[in-house]
């Protein structure tokens, strides 16, 4: 059975992104194994860590989880027309050390939500741009934006 990792871009307890992700997980569980990949415990990325023989435990756990799934669903809110800092940090952590990216050749669906009328379009676009650089193949159509949520 295929395995899908779900990353919630908000680290706020009881966030709407978390609720959306939980509902998506319930739907997906019918066809695939689902694993939530936590990002709240990731220390802020620092390139000095790349030179360490032993990486922070949260980095190791996160990278192993990303490498262990066949595809990803990233559910993100929008903060000031951009992805949340915690999500950008997770993308950076998974991409390092150089040449050892956990993201390489993964497939992903990006879902965004926001209380505004643009429904997280800015955040989703930003996430997709970073994922493209990381060699993650995003699902282009259909797009999933939840406005005024």
Predicted regions, residues:
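N-terminal beta1-alpha1-beta2 submodule of the flavodoxin-like/Rossmannoid cofactor-binding fold
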Residues: 1-97
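Acidic, glycine-rich active-site loops and adjacent beta-strand->loop/helix elements
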Residues: 42, 78, 112-115, 148
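Short, glycine-/small-residue-rich phosphate/pyrophosphate-handling segment
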Residues: 103-145
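Glycine-rich phosphate/pyrophosphate-binding loop and the adjoining helix
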Residues: 1, 46, 137-149
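Short, intrinsically disordered, mixed-charge
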Residues: 92-99, 129-133
């Amino acid at each position: 059975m295929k395995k899908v990792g779900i990353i919630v871009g908000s680290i706020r307890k009881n966030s709407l992104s978390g609720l959306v992700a939980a509902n998506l997980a319930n739907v997906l569980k019918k066809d695939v194994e689902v694993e939530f990949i936590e990002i709240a415990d990731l220390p802020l990325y620092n390139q000095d860590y790349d030179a360490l023989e032993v990486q922070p435990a949260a980095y190791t756990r996160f990278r192993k989880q990303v490498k262990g799934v066949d595809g990803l669903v990233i559910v993100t809110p929008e903060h000031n027309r951009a992805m949340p800092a915690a999500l950008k940090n997770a993308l950076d952590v998974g991409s390092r050390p150089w040449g050892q990216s956990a993201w390489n050749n993964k497939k992903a669906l990006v879902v965004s939500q926001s209380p505004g009328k643009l429904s997280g379009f800015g955040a989703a676009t930003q996430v997709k741009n970073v994922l493209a650089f990381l060699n993650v193949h995003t699902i282009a159509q259909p797009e999933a934006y939840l406005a005024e949520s």
